[in-house]
């Protein structure tokens, strides 16, 4: 029996089911996976180093380019971290707008994940249905910020600008008809025999194992632990909103899918609550050293013009110190740790990407499964290499 050899198989980095540039070296015993070795770094752009040479405002767009399928969540974490260092108050309307767009971002992310995971195991219809809905949300992004993806909308001190007239009403109309599409996908997948055969019991993980690997977000909740930063460590106005935390039982691919489906419904409810409660008022801090003055003021006041020039040429100086801010991003806990040396540039910025912890457990989760299950497992991890490779 000693002459039995395992086979080495390269999965990716051009494989469509690799969800980006993942090179996976699989050690196979026939169809069974003995070892899975992820090779990352093919999308490494040195973001953390680049940020050290930019002002605090110039560093913001880099965060859109990390997890590029849910951009606003990353900006949010960065802005909260800078605001902690500046000890700056954000107007209440800006907080509502932030939460509104972050929940739309969560829907955006889960629509992509569910449809592409279904495509990986052979179901094509959800992709065609859900991408149409994603396009509508991206249109809201564009109307608010001018860009479909790289919005740079949430900024330290508030948001870039107030939403244009009619946008809130259009989001309300969209949110009214949108749940019907989720029900259709639910009908198509949830009790589908083939879908269940491909996902039930695949890569099961317990709460303890999930915590040991550093899981967060839907991956941790699918294992059965109701841990959500929006409830456990509320930020912005989440403590004033009413929502449930969906949890799974078995921590397998199927439970992760169910958790994400329910999270979409909870996000719909949160968006409705934001639209009902959003007050009138300013959308950025009145401190002109942090946020630029309005154009009309600049045309009239020399002081406003100087503030504007200083802000965009030199940027603001952040007090010496360090801060960590984390948000419940669609993929898990997205954290930003900034060390400031009192200048206008961060001394060090560390980014905690949730996908990194999930991918490191791939060997543990894939061991003993079949080759065909790798696509289902990677799809359920919801990984994007912009944030993993940074």
Swiss-Prot record:
The UniProt entry, under HAMAP family, shows: NDH1_NuoD
User: Where does the record say this protein resides?
Assistant: Cell membrane
- What membrane topology term does the record carry? Peripheral membrane protein
Q: Which family does it belong to?
A: Belongs to the complex I 49 kDa subunit family.
Record-given protein name: NADH-quinone oxidoreductase subunit D
Look up keyword Translocase and say if it applies.
yes
User: What functional role does this protein have?
Assistant: NDH-1 shuttles electrons from NADH, via FMN and iron-sulfur (Fe-S) centers, to quinones in the respiratory chain. The immediate electron acceptor for the enzyme in this species is believed to be ubiquinone. Couples the redox reaction to proton translocation (for every two electrons transferred, four hydrogen ions are translocated across the cytoplasmic membrane), and thus conserves the redox energy in a proton gradient.
Q: Give the reaction(s) catalysed.
A: a quinone + NADH + 5 H(+)(in) = a quinol + NAD(+) + 4 H(+)(out)
Source organism of this protein record: Wolbachia sp. subsp. Brugia malayi (strain TRS)
The molecular function GO annotations come to: NAD binding; NADH:ubiquinone reductase (non-electrogenic) activity; quinone binding
Keywords attached to this Swiss-Prot or TrEMBL record, sorted alphabetically, are: Cell membrane, Membrane, NAD, Quinone, Translocase, Transport, Ubiquinone
Give the record's GO CC terms.
plasma membrane
List the gene name: nuoD
Which top-rank group of organisms is this from?
A: Bacteria
**In the UniProt record, does the keyword Membrane occur?**
yes
User: Which EC number(s) does UniProt give?
Assistant: 7.1.1.-
* Oligomer and partners: NDH-1 is composed of 14 different subunits. Subunits NuoB, C, D, E, F, and G constitute the peripheral sector of the complex.
